[in-house]
Structures are given as structure tokens and as C-alpha cells.
Regions:
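Charge-dense, helix-prone N-terminal extensions
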Residues: 1-133
Length: 133
């Protein structure tokens, strides 16, 4: 099995969160950490240098390379909080319409703040990602 640049590490999640300079981003990260852990029942792990991931599964690319990745995760970036899900979030038109202020990628949500969204809708998205694999 090959190793990704953003592979699971043994780094401390609490130290990672405490090192976030932006206090609002730190508070949102602590809240999101608690929410995802409660939904998934899984311990958080640092993946790469800046992703907090929950759960783990193996997948194989079309070229045959096999990797491990997390079921759901987040990254507290400077511009936004990114929530990673393991399915095409753009297929969730009904949930996204109710979520609040956000942007999307194929497998991620970009949030400025948890205060801008409906947390219960986010919880449904997180739960679906956790069950996806």
C-alpha cells in the first residue's frame, strides 16, 4: 500500500487545535471536533500536516494504487474551515439549500464560520459521510 502525503500521523490533535492562532477558528474547530466525534464514535487523528480525520478505510485507484483515507474530517484553514466528506456533496441539493452560508467542492464544504450554518444540517451530512464506506 502506498503512503499519501496526507497520511495518518501520530501528532496530537489537541496540540494541533490549540496552536490555531485565530480564536474564532479555534473555537469552531473545537466544536466541530466534538460534533464529529459524537456522531462517528471514532477518535480523531491528524492526517498530513493539517487535517483532522475520523475513521479509516482503504480504497484503490483505477491505476491499482491502494491508499488509506478517513471517513470524515476537517481542516481549519486561514480563509475557511473545510469539512471533508467521502461522497459528492453537490448531490445533496436539499441539505445544501438548508445549510446556510457555504461553498462546495466535490467532496468538501467550505465554511467561514459555524455560526453561519445550521448545525443540524451539517450533522446529517457528517453522519452520511461516516456511513458511506
Amino acid at each position: 500500500m502506498k503512503t499519501l502525503v496526507n497520511a495518518e500521523t501520530n501528532k496530537s490533535v489537541s496540540e494541533f487545535i490549540e496552536a490555531i492562532a485565530n480564536q474564532k477558528r479555534k473555537a469552531d474547530s473545537k466544536e466541530l471536533l466534538e460534533i464529529i466525534q459524537k456522531i462517528t464514535g471514532k477518535e480523531p487523528k491528524i492526517w498530513g500536516v493539517g487535517i483532522v480525520g475520523f475513521g479509516k478505510y482503504s480504497y484503490q485507484r483505477k491505476n491499482g494504487d491502494e491508499f488509506e483515507w478517513f471517513n470524515v474530517g476537517f481542516s481549519p484553514g486561514k480563509a475557511h474551515l473545510t469539512v471533508y466528506v467521502m461522497y459528492d456533496i453537490n448531490e445533496e441539493k436539499d441539505l445544501l439549500a438548508k445549510l446556510g452560508k457555504h461553498k462546495t467542492g466535490r467532496g468538501c464544504l467550505y465554511l467561514k464560520s459555524l455560526a453561519d450554518i445550521d448545525i443540524n444540517v451539517l450533522k446529517k451530512i457528517i453522519a452520511k459521510s461516516d456511513r458511506w464506506r
